[in-house]
């Protein structure tokens, strides 16, 4: 019967279908020839839930118990099983029949005639009423003729299960119609439609196969409805798969676990008859977990005394591939046979072991079902095989106790072989452990083992340095002071364990780029001339640190890393690239050296204190501050530093130093403003009424470049003891009479090219002067010079680089010049009896006290 004939018959039957409301017998029900039916309700009052009940009693057959979960149907509708009346939990009642029967002639007139023409008993409850929720025309062209067949008749046509108890072998036949979606159209009986659900699922399975749905080959719903399909397909199959079971017994727990899954993905499309009859499904294969390969699994043993791995006896063994190792915890002796791959397209990959079973494929012809089964089995083997790429388990000989390095000669070794050259290349990329993240490690070769290398080097250096010390103690836990300078150390990982109680640690002149690994209880830490950057300069945990030297490093930001150390007293950060003075925090430091950095602009200490927002510590405790050799052009409010005693501003292009705050600093004792390049023009306190008064009246030491304002100051600090003026003009020199009120004992006037002589009354103006430094001036007359010197107090005299000490080009010889220097020395000694040191040339001239 062709498709056109089917459509014609179906259309003729649908012509008799009427949708008119039937006659009413009573308010809620009506009858047709004595049968009582539910009243037909309008669409607005119709409830879809009346035809979607899934709750059934256990007495119902397997074919209607568990409708499969159809995830994708290519927009085709599903078939729902209507539960017979008389069961609890359903929407049907005992006195009602399906609505559609009343619209067909001959149904319900006491004969109980079924749609298929079979005659049943009048009192028989229909086993099932199908409700197909979509247009029938959607299935035209794909519906088969003999669709709803008797379930028992189909069972009789299937291939029976053959069980061989001696060999424990089960033979199951498969039909190629399953793969081709060709259903059997033999002459089955149309008497009674006792199990149409399974047949309906077969129809939809054929639709999905023909329409190329997203069901994968080998994936089939593993429920009770599939039993009929598998049994029908077995009729036309002459090829078989022999399954050698070592253990057919399955526990109850395994059955329950298997039935919880809706689908099964396996290489075989059919199940064994024993499984189909009991509702069991094949257990889903799982890949064995991958185990981590450690040095201990390679035979190495860690030596805690030497801090290294002891190599195994078979150290020369080369493991060329990680697949040669068994990473699973299973016992391979339990598996009898492995599935052969058969073809060359597997590229030599090892076959997978399948749950203690050996599968033997008996058909190899390309046209047979067994051949296709074999191909599908091989694809599953490749999918389930452990082909995860792993690097070869490698171990560097540098980390072993012997520390030997094997040299590879001859042929080239593969990238997976263990070779020292490969290992050393890997370690070159892993020198900076803190910059790497553990989550980025994807293979064994990327694991950073530089910790063991550093600790080994550290132990060697400690042994060599401590053994030469007279106070050497074999117990390293008692060591309090260690000097590891010039050791070419890159980091200090492991030192906390080796030297837990060290207090003074010198790590200068190494190659460190981080402070990690240094014992946190250290009090004095010297790390100058390394490669430490601001990103890896963390002082968190160094709560007892008091002295820190990080000079000659790569620090390039601010002082925020110092804020965590509250007990810091001395910090040397010279010769870095620090750009800001912010972030000092509440550390109570006293000495801070920031010379030779990249600090620029105007420094306002009042603003720094407000920004720091620290009641105690920070800038409020600084006593010695060195800002020399930066790019500072202005300084303001030095008086805001209440404890500042020494300030060094040499080597900056300073233009002005101005005090504008009301605070007065009575602690500043030394101020140095030299080598400004002649830019200095203002040194003034705007809060003082007398602008001719020096701004800092408690100074003892003042060193500065000569500028015009010096000659205008009339009141110098009474406490001034050392005055040094470098450069400028003679007219800008201070008046010596204004210095009479000071306690000056050392005066330096250097590099003033137009300064030709001392004032005549110098001995009266500076009666307590002991040191007179006059290098690089234009002093020409020795007799005038000696007459103006303070006779009783001068002990040190420096006359270098003046005309009276420099030989002229027309002089006869060097010996003559030497005799003139001796005469000058005699005059100075005669004028100043207390003179102890006289500098006339690069070497001190002989005096009466040192002859």
From Swiss-Prot:
There is a cross-link at residue 357 (Glycyl lysine isopeptide (Lys-Gly) (interchain with G-Cter in ubiquitin)). Residues 1-31, 216-352 are annotated as: Disordered. One of its GO terms (cellular component) is nuclear envelope. Residues 8-21, 291-304 have a biased composition (Polar residues). It is found in: Cytoplasm, Cytoskeleton, Microtubule organizing center, Spindle pole body; Nucleus envelope. Keywords: Cell cycle, Cell division, Cytoplasm, Cytoskeleton, Isopeptide bond, Leucine-rich repeat, Meiosis, Mitosis, Nucleus, Phosphoprotein, Repeat, Ubl conjugation. GO terms for biological process: astral microtubule organization; cell division; establishment of spindle localization; initial mitotic spindle pole body separation; meiotic chromosome segregation; positive regulation of exit from mitosis; regulation of mitotic cytokinesis; septation initiation signaling. The modification Phosphoserine is found at residues 417, 419. LRR repeats lie at residues 544-566, 567-588, 589-609, 621-642, 643-664. Phosphorylated from S/G2 phase until the end of mitosis. Residues 223-246, 260-278, 320-333 have a biased composition (Low complexity). InterPro entries: CDIRP, Leu-rich_rpt, Leu-rich_rpt_4, LRR_dom_sf. It comes from the Eukaryota. Pfam families: LRR_4, LRR_6. The modification Phosphothreonine is found at residues 388, 392. Its main location: cytoplasm. One of its GO terms (molecular function) is signaling adaptor activity. Present with 892 molecules/cell in log phase SD medium. Involved in astral microtubule organization by binding SCP72 to the outer plaque in a cell-cycle dependent manner. Required for the mitotic exit by facilitating the binding of TEMP1 to CDC15. Also involved in the pathway that organizes the shaping and sizing of the prospore membrane (PSM) during sporulation. Interacts directly with MPC54, CNM67, SPO21/MPC70, ADY3 and ADY4. Probable component of a spindle pole boby (SPB) complex composed of ADY3, SSP1, DON1, MPC54, SPO21/MPC70, NUD1 and CNM67. This is Protein NUD1. It comes from Saccharomyces cerevisiae (strain ATCC 204508 / S288c). The lineage of its organism: Eukaryota, Fungi, Dikarya, Ascomycota, Saccharomycotina.
């Amino acid at each position: 019967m062709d498709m056109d004939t089917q459509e014609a018959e179906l259309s003729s039957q649908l012509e008799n279908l009427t949708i008119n409301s039937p006659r009413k017998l009573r308010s809620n029900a009506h009858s047709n020839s004595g049968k009582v039916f539910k009243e037909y309700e309008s669409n607005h009052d119709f409830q879809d839930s009346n035809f979607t009940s899934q709750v059934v009693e256990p007495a119902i057959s397997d074919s209607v118990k568990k409708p499969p979960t159809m995830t994708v149907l290519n927009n085709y509708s599903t078939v729902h099983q209507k539960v017979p009346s008389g069961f609890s939990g359903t929407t049907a009642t005992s006195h009602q029949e399906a609505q559609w029967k009343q619209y067909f002639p001959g149904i319900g007139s006491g004969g109980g005639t079924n749609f298929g023409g079979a005659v049943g008993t009048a009192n028989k409850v229909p086993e099932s009423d199908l409700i197909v929720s979509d247009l029938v025309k959607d299935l035209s062209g794909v519906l088969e003729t003999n669709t709803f067949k008797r379930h028992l008749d189909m069972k009789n046509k299937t291939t029976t299960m053959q069980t061989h108890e001696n060999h424990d072998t089960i033979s199951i036949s498969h039909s190629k119609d399953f793969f081709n979606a060709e259903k059997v159209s033999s002459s089955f009986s149309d008497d009674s439609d006792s199990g149409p659900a399974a047949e309906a699922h077969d129809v939809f399975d054929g639709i999905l196969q023909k329409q190329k749905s997203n069901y994968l080959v080998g994936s089939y719903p593993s429920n009770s409805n599939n039993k009929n399909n598998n049994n029908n397909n077995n009729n036309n199959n002459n090829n078989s798969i022999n399954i050698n079971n070592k253990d057919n017994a399955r526990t109850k727990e395994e059955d329950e676990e298997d039935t919880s899954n809706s689908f099964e993905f396996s290489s075989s499309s059919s199940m064994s008859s024993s499984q189909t009859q009991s509702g069991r499904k094949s257990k889903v294969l799982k890949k064995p977990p991958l185990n981590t390969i450690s040095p201990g699994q390679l035979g190495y043993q860690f030596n805690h005394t030497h801090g290294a791995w002891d190599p195994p006896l078979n150290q020369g063994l080369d493991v060329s591939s990680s697949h040669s190792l068994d990473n699973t915890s299973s016992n391979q002796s339990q598996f009898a046979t492995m599935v052969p791959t058969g073809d060359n397209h597997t590229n030599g990959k090892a076959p997978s072991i399948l749950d203690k079973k050996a599968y033997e494929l008996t058909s190899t012809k390309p046209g047979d079902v067994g051949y296709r089964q074999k191909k599908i089995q091989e694809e599953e083997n490749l999918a389930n095989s452990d082909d995860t790429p792993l690097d070869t388990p490698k171990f560097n000989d540098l980390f072993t106790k012997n520390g030997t390095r094997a040299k590879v000669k001859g042929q080239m070794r593969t990238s997976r072989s263990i070779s020292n050259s490969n290992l050393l290349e890997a370690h070159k990329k892993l020198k900076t452990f803190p910059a790497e993240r553990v989550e980025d490690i994807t293979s064994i070769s990327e694991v950073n083992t530089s910790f063991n290398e550093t600790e080994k080097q550290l132990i060697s250096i400690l042994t060599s340095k401590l053994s030469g010390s007279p106070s050497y103690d074999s117990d390293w836990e008692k060591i309090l002071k260690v000097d590891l300078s010039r050791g070419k150390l890159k980091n200090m990982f492991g030192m906390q364990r080796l030297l837990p109680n060290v207090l003074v640690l010198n790590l200068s002149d190494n190659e460190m780029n981080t402070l990690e690994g240094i014992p946190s209880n250290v009090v004095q830490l010297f790390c100058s001339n390394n490669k430490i950057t601001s990103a890896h300069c963390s002082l968190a945990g160094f709560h007892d640190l008091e002295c820190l030297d990080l000079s000659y490093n790569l620090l390039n930001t601010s002082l925020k890393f110092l804020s965590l150390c509250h007990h810091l007293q001395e910090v040397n950060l010279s010769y870095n690239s620090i750009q800001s003075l912010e972030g000092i925090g509440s550390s109570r430091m006293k000495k801070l050296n920031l010379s030779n950095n990249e600090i620029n602009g105007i420094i306002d200490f009042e603003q720094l204190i407000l920004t720091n927002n620290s009641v105690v510590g920070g800038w409020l405790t600084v006593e010695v501050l060195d800002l020399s050799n930066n790019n500072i052009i202005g300084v303001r409010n030095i008086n805001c530093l209440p404890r500042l005693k020494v300030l060094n501003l040499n080597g900056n292009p300073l233009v002005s130093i101005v005090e504008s705050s009301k605070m007065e600093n009575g602690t500043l004792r030394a101020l140095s403003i030299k080598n400004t390049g002649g830019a200095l023009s203002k040194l003034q306190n705007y809060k003082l009424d007398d602008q001719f008064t020096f701004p800092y009246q408690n100074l003892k030491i003042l060193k500065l470049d000569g500028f015009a304002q010096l000659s205008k100051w009339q009141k110098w600090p009474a406490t001034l003891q050392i005055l040094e003026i470098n450069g400028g003009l003679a007219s800008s020199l201070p008046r010596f009479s204004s210095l009479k009120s000071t306690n000056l004992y050392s005066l330096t006037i250097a590099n003033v090219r137009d300064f030709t002589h001392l004032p005549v009354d110098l001995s009266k103006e500076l009666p307590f002067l002991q040191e007179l430094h006059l290098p690089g001036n234009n002093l020409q007359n020795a007799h005038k010079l000696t007459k103006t010197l303070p006779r009783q107090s001068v002990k040190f005299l420096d006359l270098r680089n003046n005309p009276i000490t420099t030989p002229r080009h027309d002089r006869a010889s060097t010996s003559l010049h030497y005799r003139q220097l001796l005469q000058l020395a005699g005059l100075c000694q005669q004028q100043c009896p207390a003179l102890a040191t006289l500098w006339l040339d690069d070497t001190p001239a002989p005096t009466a006290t040192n002859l």
